[in-house]
Amino acid sequence: MENLQSILPEDKPQTPVLEPHNFFLYGAPMAGKSYFASFFPHPLSLNTDGNAEQGTAPAIQIRNTFNRDGSLNQNSIYQLSSIVVALQQPGVTYRTVIVDVIDDICTMFEQAICKQYKALSLADIPYGKGYQLLNTSLQQLVLDLKALPMDVVFISRELDKTDEKTGRTDYVPSLKTKYYDIVTGNCDAVIHFTKIGNEYLRQVTQKRANYKKADIKNPAVLKLLSSCTGMFTNEK
């Protein structure tokens, strides 16, 4: 009989591995998000913007396609699932996956689910099943990407929210809060991109740990993250 204790790790403290691999970028159009992401090592862009040809990274256009009768031909949920399986195979040379943009992926998932159930909206699918399917599909995608031995970059647009009392304007990701929580809950850093005149600014708004430059093993990634204000703590 197998010794069940053999599957347990040794009972002693482990040295944390702090190297970040999952990133969430958001900002206004033309703030440099896709350009920045394209400099990650050996990137593959899963593109929804229709501007993949303008970048240097190899890209796959993610989309739902339809038959003449309006029924679903290509399902974006299954398309992305197949891509993840392909990236899991031996000999794959890609080292970064870019999801550009995650907002559109959520919209496509919703559209695919509604078509599958012949509903106009998720609310029309009984017992909340539509919302459950969308949440599950997004969670599965994020977890599958995170499990890859690669860097993963999610890109989102931004919204401006102005407080009527104070007049203060804050810039937040356009991704709905419940989906934002699913994605960023599996990310190591959130980076806000802005462009003022000809200057591009990158500010880390959230991070999982107090990273040091020594935590980053890949020189190309280190160079990218070093350009983001607030990424590294107490280091010049």
Q: Model-found features: residue ranges?
A:
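Conserved acidic residues
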Residues: 43, 95, 150-151, 188
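Intrinsic-disorder-associated interaction segments
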Residues: 73-76, 127, 218
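Hydrophobic, Leu/Ile/Phe/Ala-enriched alpha-helical segments that form helix-helix packing faces
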Residues: 84-88, 141-145, 187
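P-loop NTPase motor core
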Residues: 96, 101-182
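Conserved P-loop
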Residues: 2-99, 103-108
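Phosphate-binding/switch region of NTP-binding enzymes
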Residues: 152-223
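Charged phosphate-binding loop/patch that engages nucleotide di/tri-phosphates or the phosphate backbone
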Residues: 217-236
